[in-house]
């Protein structure tokens, strides 16, 4: 699959194009230019390191939305075995923007739930661009309750611009569905490990992300609104999205500093879309470490830990009035 380069990656794209051109020439020539190819490859790698070491929040948001970034089903294929997808909310319909089912993680039975976008126009429409309707969240709730009943740990993967804002979704109780999920997750008797793998868009993301461990991939984002939406409200123009991204503090490192997430999972050089298997291996290791800390923990201890965790959000300290 040919790599799609973002605007700020154009210097890398030009180098990679030159390397491909030289490889093509080498195949049709008796002249050995392997040293030049190696030199340019090293230069490209160093340039990628330099660019990715100084990303702005807006550039991180672009990476989180990269069309070639791994989605939930990509991680399911690489990390889990014996995945059996379960469908429908048993109330209205089967929302394909959320997928879920039974699987095995390192041989242990578990439940996997996640947002799913699409690769081409047809699949994106089928998946509603990763924006769930109420039936999607109710499907997720049904699967969480099923996992709770059988004592299965839950892994969720978050990647959505947000909950679908259409009239039909509102008519069927979008906010109620999200709120009910938050209630259910808070009381689960099994561990829930949530991973933000791409976009973490507002309540649409939170609806499957009230976890005992919340982790983010290095170039994922998590915020109450998209940069464009924030800019449109504050500055009346989406062109201010870069400034909005800065103000939102949507990057993994910023959220970790604020105590809103627990872990950051490093990505391969150039982002997760450059190396699916490498990214999956890093994520699998992190998931195993997260799950291990709940071994031997009683339900009472697990729920008490989660309760304390939830109450810790938004704490503030009072200071004496200044003269």
Curated annotation (Swiss-Prot):
The keyword Repressor does not apply. One of its GO terms (molecular function) is ATP binding. It is found in: Cytoplasm. The keyword Lipid biosynthesis applies. Pfam families: ACCA (PF03255). Its EC number is 2.1.3.15. Belongs to the AccA family. This is Acetyl-coenzyme A carboxylase carboxyl transferase subunit alpha. It comes from Cupriavidus taiwanensis (strain DSM 17343 / BCRC 17206 / CCUG 44338 / CIP 107171 / LMG 19424 / R1).
